[in-house]
Design a protein with these regions (language model features):
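Sec-dependent N-terminal signal peptides
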Residues: 1-3
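Extracellular/periplasmic metallocenter environments
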Residues: 5-6, 11, 22-24, 95-151
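Conserved functional micro-motifs across diverse proteins
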Residues: 9-18, 37
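Beta-strand cores of secreted/periplasmic/IMS beta-sandwich domains, seen most often
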Residues: 15-19, 48-76, 104-113, 117
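N-terminal edge beta-strand
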Residues: 23-59
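Ordered hydrophobic segments in well-structured contexts
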Residues: 29, 51, 61, 118-120, ...
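A mature extracytoplasmic/lumenal domain signature
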Residues: 32-34, 58, 64-68, 76-80, ...
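Histidine- and aromatic-enriched segments that form or immediately flank copper-ligand environments
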Residues: 67-101, 127-134
C-alpha cells in the first residue's frame, strides 16, 4: 500500500491582517516557520507570495513570532538583500541575529512614503531562501493582503 502525502494549504492571508480604519492603523502578523512550506523559510505559510497593501500615512504595527527551530526576524526593507530598514523603527531589535524559537517581537512605523518594499527575514541566508513578502504603500485605498499565486 502506497502512502500519499498531501500538502495542507496555508490559511487565508486575511487572517494575519487587522485593520482599524477610523484610526488609520493596521496590524500585520508575521509567523516565521508557520509550517513546512519552503522548508520552514516562510511567513504565515507563504514564501514571497503575499502582498500587503497599506495606504500612505497609516500606522503599521508588525507582530513577528518565531515558531521555527531556527532564529528568524522581521524587517521592512527596500530592495533585495537590503539590511537597512526602509522606515524608522521598521525592524525588530537585532534583525540579523533574529528571534529565538518561541519568541515574539513587535515594531511600529508610519508608512510615510509610497513604494514597494519587502517584509523580510534578515538572518543571513533567509531572504535568499525566499523568506519575504511584498509590502506596497499606496497613495489611497484600503489595507489588504493577497496571495499572489491566486492572481
Amino acid at each position: 500500500m502506497a502512502l500519499a502525502l498531501v500538502a495542507t494549504p496555508p490559511p487565508p492571508p486575511h487572517r494575519f491582517l487587522s485593520v482599524d480604519a477610523p484610526r488609520h492603523r493596521v496590524t500585520i502578523t508575521l509567523i516565521a516557520s508557520y509550517d513546512a512550506e519552503n522548508n520552514g523559510f516562510n511567513f504565515d505559510g507563504y514564501s514571497r507570495y503575499l502582498m500587503w497593501t497599506v495606504p500612505q500615512g497609516w500606522t503599521v504595527r508588525v507582530v513577528c513570532e518565531n515558531r521555527g527551530p531556527l532564529r528568524h526576524s522581521c524587517a521592512v526593507v527596500q530592495g533585495a538583500s537590503s539590511a537597512t530598514p526602509a522606515f524608522r523603527g521598521a525592524e525588530i531589535p537585532q534583525p540579523q541575529v533574529g528571534l529565538e524559537a518561541g519568541h515574539t517581537a513587535r515594531f511600529t512605523f508610519r508608512a510615510s512614503r509610497k513604494g514597494v518594499y519587502r517584509l523580510a527575514c534578515l538572518v543571513s541566508g533567509h531572504e535568499e531562501a525566499r523568506m519575504w513578502d511584498v509590502l506596497k504603500i499606496v497613495r489611497h485605498g484600503r489595507p489588504s493582503v493577497v496571495d499572489l499565486r491566486a492572481r
